[in-house]
From Swiss-Prot:
Sites annotated Could be important to modulate the pK values of the two catalytic cysteine residues: H161, E210
Task performed by this protein: Catalyzes the stereoinversion of LL-2,6-diaminopimelate (L,L-DAP) to meso-diaminopimelate (meso-DAP), a precursor of L-lysine and an essential component of the bacterial peptidoglycan.
Protein name: Diaminopimelate epimerase
EC number of the protein: 5.1.1.7
InterPro entries noted in UniProt: DAP_epimerase_AS, DAP_epimerase_DapF
Subcellular location: Cytoplasm
Record has Cytoplasm as a keyword: yes
Similarity annotation: Belongs to the diaminopimelate epimerase family.
UniProt-listed Pfam families: DAP_epimerase
Primary site of residence: cytoplasm
Natural source organism: Nitrosococcus oceani (strain ATCC 19707 / BCRC 17464 / JCM 30415 / NCIMB 11848 / C-107)
GO biological process, one term: lysine biosynthetic process via diaminopimelate
Length: 276
């Protein structure tokens, strides 16, 4: 079966996006791994599917698969690419979209300047919602790592995140601590790991080790997680520029019980087809 796809990227975080409306398909984990393979397939951090809406008030379904073949709940950079894809493909003429993810409904706004703003939903801090194994909720937690105690914040942005504050992201132990924290037994569904350097109340630098993908140039949910953890700790304001290796995202959050809004670019790289 030959499937048409579009290769897209948001701040260097790259995706293979497939219209599963006009060409219905159900991908196996091995097919996802093959598509994502940078030597044998197309190559990407994640595979995104546009699927039929399941509710009248929803425009599309949005499914997300990591490069390791596992389906995940949310991806912010992917959501921006998703929004641009459905407009470019002529699947909608709307500027505001409501899409269904595995973690709930999100709103996507296509701005006149080409940026895309995403309602990433309300962050969840309750340990059972992350999920994170701990007796009670707190603003920060101590984990043992490499024989030392490491202080983290934990939050769900539709997918689990932990955030560490570091003096400088350039020298942060991302390659070593990233996989150790990703698979830490206190996170039963594994976790995305953010290494955050606070530059000023309105500016942070961030590197993210993504669950199932490793370090990537950018992570939208990771940027949201770092911004909300930083605001909760009193380090950051409600409007923050987040600089990742791939570029800058704007994050706005007014506080507990409010949605996080993320703004950034989405670009088409090329189009093609692949035999599955």
């Amino acid at each position: 079966m030959r499937i048409a796809f579009t290769k897209m990227q948001g701040l260097g975080n790259d995706f293979v996006v497939i219209d599963a409306l006009s060409q219905p398909l159900s991908l196996t984990a091995s097919q996802v791994r093959w598509i994502a393979n940078r030597r044998l397939g197309i190559g990407c951090d994640q595979v995104l599917l546009v699927t039929p809406a399941s509710l009248p008030a929803i425009d599309f379904g949005y499914r997300i698969f990591n490069a390791d073949g596992g389906e995940v709940e949310q991806c912010g950079n992917g959501a921006r690419c998703f929004a641009r894809f459905v407009r470019e493909q002529g699947l909608t003429d709307k500027n505001v979209l409501r899409v269904q993810t595995a973690s709930g409904i999100i709103e996507l706004q296509l701005e006149t300047d080409g940026q895309i703003t995403v309602d990433m939903g309300v962050p969840r801090f309750a340990p059972h919602q992350i999920p994170f194994k701990v007796d009670q909720e707190a603003d920060y937690y101590s984990l043992e790592l490499d024989g030392q105690q490491v202080e983290i914040g934990a939050v769900s942005m539709g997918n689990p995140h932990c955030v560490l504050r570091v003096p400088a992201v350039d020298t942060a132990p991302v390659a070593h601590w990233g996989p150790l924290l990703e698979s830490h037994p206190r996170f039963p569904q594994r976790v995305n790991v953010g290494f955050a350097q606070i530059v000023s109340p309105g500016h942070l630098r961030l590197r993210v080790y993504e669950r199932g993908a490793g370090e990537t140039p950018a992570c939208g949910t990771g940027a949201c997680a770092a911004a909300v953890i930083g605001k909760r700790r009193g380090w950051l304001s409600g409007q923050v520029n987040v600089d990742l290796p791939g570029g800058r995202l704007g994050i706005h959050w007014e506080g507990d019980g409010k949605s996080v809004w993320m703004s950034g670019p989405a670009e088409i790289v090329f189009k093609g087809s692949i035999e599955l």
